[in-house]
Amino acid sequence: MTEIIDGNAVAQSIRDDLVASIDRLADAGHRPSLATVLMSEDPASETYVSMKQDDCEEVGIEAIDIDIDSDADAAELYDTIEDLNADEDVNGILVQMPVPDHVEDRSVLRAIDPMKDVDGFHPENVGRLVAGDARYKPCTPHGIQKLIESAGVDTEGKDAVVVGRSDIVGKPMANLLIQKAPGGNATTTVCHSRTENLAERTRNADILVAAAGVPEMIDGKMIQEGATVIDVGINRVDADTEKGYELVGDVEYESAKEVAGAITPVPGGVGPMTRAMLLYNTVKATGLQHDIDVDLP
């Protein structure tokens, strides 16, 4: 019988486990804090930032909310980041993407102090990840590692296929899977929009991570029997519902769950884990900045 990997439950367990470390840091005078910077009127971005703030409140992390008008000069955003970098009471900084077209997103990521880059996207932190010495693992790939672990799947020696090569998920996910570390040691293939014979490659996967952003591009016929399937996609498609749409993943769930050994649903799979690992990185950042050992789940 296929195991449905409950991302909400795993994320809740991680949040619960973080509370003791947060309390320890607070007792030492360093309650973790996370600053989220929003420069957008996009409703989805606003909702996501609000959810992150709720997560912080649940576990006892101080949430600092900064809104910048989307029409403001890029200099206002960079000045804000500079102030947050210099503020010793701020442990983590997250600029919600996407930023407006007149702001260059890579420049924004480079502007954040690498020690406070709890998304793990600063070039220094990307380099450390590739070198096998990650300071902060990017939240979504790290959350996926935790989901695979929760399903009792040992990645060592397995064939893993990552569909998607984004800087946010695909590339760092592949890097984590190949590393000589728990949750790694897999033989890993990265597929993308130019990959030929995609189905042939995905059918060889013991572990399949679908992160291409294409609705239901992977169906049951493309999956090896018993494979662990992690669906990162969250796509809005037209549907005969009250809202006029529904959310689907990159995997056609109904056919896939008939074949997979374990699978994440959409929603309720990877999404909650991304948010939980942001809290994880914020707690880790606080410990590193104040030279305090913290127990992390």
UniProtKB/Swiss-Prot annotation:
One of its GO terms (molecular function) is methylenetetrahydrofolate dehydrogenase (NADP+) activity. Keywords: Amino-acid biosynthesis, Histidine biosynthesis, Hydrolase, Methionine biosynthesis, Multifunctional enzyme, NADP, One-carbon metabolism, Oxidoreductase, Purine biosynthesis. GO terms for biological process: L-histidine biosynthetic process; methionine biosynthetic process; purine nucleotide biosynthetic process; tetrahydrofolate interconversion. GO terms for cellular component: cytosol. InterPro entries: Aminoacid_DH-like_N_sf, NAD(P)-bd_dom_sf, THF_DH/CycHdrlase, THF_DH/CycHdrlase_cat_dom, THF_DH/CycHdrlase_NAD-bd_dom. It comes from the Archaea. It catalyses: (6R)-5,10-methylene-5,6,7,8-tetrahydrofolate + NADP(+) = (6R)-5,10-methenyltetrahydrofolate + NADPH; (6R)-5,10-methenyltetrahydrofolate + H2O = (6R)-10-formyltetrahydrofolate + H(+). Its EC number is 1.5.1.5, 3.5.4.9. The keyword Hydrolase applies. NADP(+) binds at residues 164-166, 193, 234. Pathway: One-carbon metabolism; tetrahydrofolate interconversion. Homodimer. Belongs to the tetrahydrofolate dehydrogenase/cyclohydrolase family. HAMAP family: THF_DHG_CYH. Catalyzes the oxidation of 5,10-methylenetetrahydrofolate to 5,10-methenyltetrahydrofolate and then the hydrolysis of 5,10-methenyltetrahydrofolate to 10-formyltetrahydrofolate. This is Bifunctional protein FolD 1. It comes from Haloarcula marismortui (strain ATCC 43049 / DSM 3752 / JCM 8966 / VKM B-1809) (Halobacterium marismortui).
